[in-house]
């Protein structure tokens, strides 16, 4: 005997979700304005089962039990007892098949001519993304036995009633040409994210567990500036973005190992927040038909939660998540190339300098010091000859001097590549 969750007439150890999407898009043009507009529909049925209550409604956070006295796999209302606490005679669980859910997302954008050398653009879009299936189906093969699930399934349950994650985005910009060679643009954008996946604490009898749900949220906003210069043999562009990204949780599973707090959530800097982003590139033609290009890039470091001392031992500063920032990323690349034709074939020779200034950027850091190559004296005090106290700190060394030599925490040094390319007709 088995539960046919896929409704395909046989037992299987997988799920077969169904997705459907369609969109309509159109463009309206007049001499002074262009409008793009459209609408999209997304539908999904996870083809799974969900706990339900005595009213036949979904109850993904709490199982309901009933006494199946006549063993017909159906709760006979008014005859058989039902409760949200386990322990009934001939106990069975109330389940309900998942349904189709749909989301409609409109998008619109327009570009309006202000003068013969300036335009104004605006865009709005509503976007949906289905949750990761892992968070939908996690441990749902044990829904019929909640007690076993709570005891052996690490207390986490998927949820086939979750909605798609939603993002609303607005953006506007002015684009202006100055003279024959210069142009600039100023733009601003806002992105609101909600209905993101998280795990919420639930209780059933003596058991405490976590159920996937749409509870997390975040936001991002930014300002874009672009300055461009073009000439017959020279061109360059400078792009700068200032932005702030915040979320109430770093990722869906962050609450799995967290401590339950009965208090309103709040936004903190997202782990991918980079407030300053600066890019510059130029290209030109040198004597002899040589093309040259240079790119330079600067980006703020990522935020991280600092390590503080609570007594003698270090611990994560949970009260101030992502309150410190790692080193910034900096890079400069230079390239030269020359094209010529010989024997009815096109040839090109080139020389690329990656990381021209030989800057060793930090990919990862130690949260105690904020440095990629120094974990802090609390840890380096254990480096030395075994059984000795090399720094007089009252601790005995048990690690070699190479233990914290981890070059992969830094980016690659300068790299010079020479190449030859042949194009065959």
What are these regions (language model features)?
Residues 1-115, 131:
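Signature of Gram-negative outer-membrane beta-barrel scaffolds
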Residues 16-20, 100-104, 166-170, 219-221, ...:
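Residues that define the transmembrane beta-barrel architecture of outer-membrane proteins
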Residues 26-30, 41, 102, 110-113, ...:
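Residue-level signature of outer-membrane beta-barrel architecture
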Residues 30-33, 113-117, 167, 179, ...:
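Outer-membrane beta-barrel channels and translocator barrels
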Residues 35-39, 120-122, 184-186, 236-238, ...:
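Transmembrane beta-strands of outer-membrane beta-barrel proteins
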Residues 44, 181-306, 421:
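Gram-negative outer-membrane beta-barrel transporters
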Residues 113, 119-121, 125, 131, ...:
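Membrane-embedded beta-barrel scaffold of Gram-negative outer-membrane proteins
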Residues 289-313, 329, 338-425:
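C-terminal beta-signal and adjacent terminal beta-strands/loops
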